[in-house]
Amino acid sequence: MQYTEVMVRYGELSTKGKNRKDFIGRLAGNVTRALQDFPEIEIHPKHDRMHIVLNGAPFETIDQRLKLVFGIQTYSPTIKVDKNLDAIKKASLELMQATFKDGMTFKVNTRRSDHDFEYDTNQLNMMIGDYLFDNMDNLKVQMKKPDLVLRIEVRQDAIYISNQLLHGAGGMPVGTAGKAVMMLSGGIDSPVASYLAMKRGVEIDMVHFFSPPYTTEKALAKAKELTGILANYSGKINFIAVPFTEIQEQIKEKLPEGYLMTIQRRFMLQLADRIRAMRGGLAIFNGESVGQVASQTLESMVAINDVTSTPVLRPVATMDKTEIIKLAEQIGTFDLSIEPFEDCCTIFAPPRPKTKPKLDEARKLEDRLDAEGMIQRAIDGMEITPIYPNQKFLDDKAQEDADLL
């Protein structure tokens, strides 16, 4: 079926009042970026919906891209025809023949914004319905929840016909809620938290801590490749690799075992906050889920959050692990997340970490270290890499090695 355009309906933009124009502009920019390798396409954002004129571009490919753009509630592949009855009949029949399967029910639903058109909605519903019955077999009308709804929209410029209502990613356009940093490990939770942050319109920079020689280049490549998967939802994500070896070695050498995890996380949060300020971010996101591990008890969060007044947001905080895994599978990060490359969150992990660390004790222990010096050296050593959708960093040999572990 050769569609002429795609009609996009906005998600929560309708709730944004005076900022609506800016939100629609941001969404149009994000759609343009997602479809940038189709120069023939024209994108026309309007107050109530967006029209994507295909000009011969294949809808099947466009469909896969639009599913990944936050801010789109629903969209429909559409045929645009002249405002005459014969053109409406012809396009309606072609569309139904291309999508109808035996046993399906249908109805015709007409809307008019051009009230000067010669037929009203009831007349069009009846005439097009009768025409379809005369030219197709096994049709069955059902007014409530039919399998197919043939939608006819009579507008000032033309008539638009569709019979599919496809669901988009929902949420808000990335970039409309400001900028933040995301503390990305190589595990399951933080990529899911990243996805949920972007779904709320947040533009994120990834902050990843690595500790060579204890962590390998493969672990770093894995985190970058996870970022490449997530970049499908935003177009590009800056990946900030922060060296963490010195800090981990000093903590292990000088502090009691039970507080290693707490102090490590305090340093990570301080570094993330410094980077946030440097990058113009407003918040810090992470993948913590309440009670999942020792560093994620409420007592631990109090002892760790003490180092910053910046909002620390945890999108998966109340989700069960099974819920997080299900979403990771849905967004395509799960298989890579479970590849067994050790990251800095697992090295030096004490066998009996404190689950209820004391804030005063954490502060005293941290004071034994050259905190400011180590933080500054880590900042000086960080590397920023722009990462694009589906960019690869793990070679085939690395994947084979992971499969053997």
Curated annotation (Swiss-Prot):
ATP binds at M183, L184, H208, F209, R265, G287, Q296. The keyword tRNA-binding applies. It is found in: Cytoplasm. Residues 60-165 form the THUMP domain. SUPFAM superfamilies: Adenine nucleotide alpha hydrolases-like, THUMP domain-like. Its main location: cytoplasm. This is Probable tRNA sulfurtransferase. It is an enzyme of class 2 (transferase). Keywords: ATP-binding, Cytoplasm, Nucleotide-binding, RNA-binding, Thiamine biosynthesis, Transferase, tRNA-binding. Its EC number is 2.8.1.4. It comes from Lactobacillus johnsonii (strain CNCM I-12250 / La1 / NCC 533).
